[in-house]
């Protein structure tokens, strides 16, 4: 009488390992795509939140905060929007329009880079006078009607 061997052959094990490898690769690719879309959605939501705070500031001060040179929002002395404009922190008695500017999501996405006139991964605010402003930012992929690449938010909306 002959005993039958129990277990898997080497070929069967290699096929199963190959299938698991292919499935895990597909899962990682899908996860990275979802992460990029999430970062881009956060960028658009952040810019909308900043523009809302600027409109509240405008209603009280009859103008927008002036920034003759471009400033990176959310860093250094531009982390809060209070009476008098962008500050490192709001003082007692100041009206706070945005207590903490949203931090930019990382890593960088998109085609905007340091050789471009557009910021790669920041919210860049400029306002030559108090009648208008622009916030430039970059998207790595499409979000709604916005395509990948550089965009500008102003009192008239996001283009």
Q: How does the language model describe each region?
A:
Residues 1-2, 56:
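Short, contiguous, well-ordered secondary-structure segments
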Residues 28-48:
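Aliphatic-rich helix starts adjacent to a transmembrane/signal segment
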Residues 55-137:
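Extracellular/periplasmic head regions of type IV pilus-like filament subunits
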Residues 127-159:
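Short, surface-exposed interaction loops/tails
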């Amino acid at each position: 009488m002959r005993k039958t061997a129990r277990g898997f052959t080497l070929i069967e094990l290699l096929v199963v390992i190959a299938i698991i490898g292919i499935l895990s690769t597909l899962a990682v690719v899908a996860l990275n795509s979802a992460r990029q879309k999430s970062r881009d959605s956060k960028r658009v939501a952040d810019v909308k939140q900043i523009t809302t705070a600027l409109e509240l500031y405008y209603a009280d001060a009859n103008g927008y905060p002036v920034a003759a040179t471009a400033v990176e929002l959310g860093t250094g002395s531009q982390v809060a929007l209070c009476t008098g404009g962008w500050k490192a922190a709001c003082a007692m008695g100041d009206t706070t329009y945005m207590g903490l500017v949203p931090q930019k999501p990382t890593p960088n996405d998109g085609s905007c880079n340091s050789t471009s006139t557009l910021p790669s991964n920041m919210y860049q605010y400029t306002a030559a006078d108090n009648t208008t402003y622009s916030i430039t930012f970059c998207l790595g992929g499409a979000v709604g009607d916005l395509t990948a690449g550089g965009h500008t938010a102003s009192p008239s909306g996001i283009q």
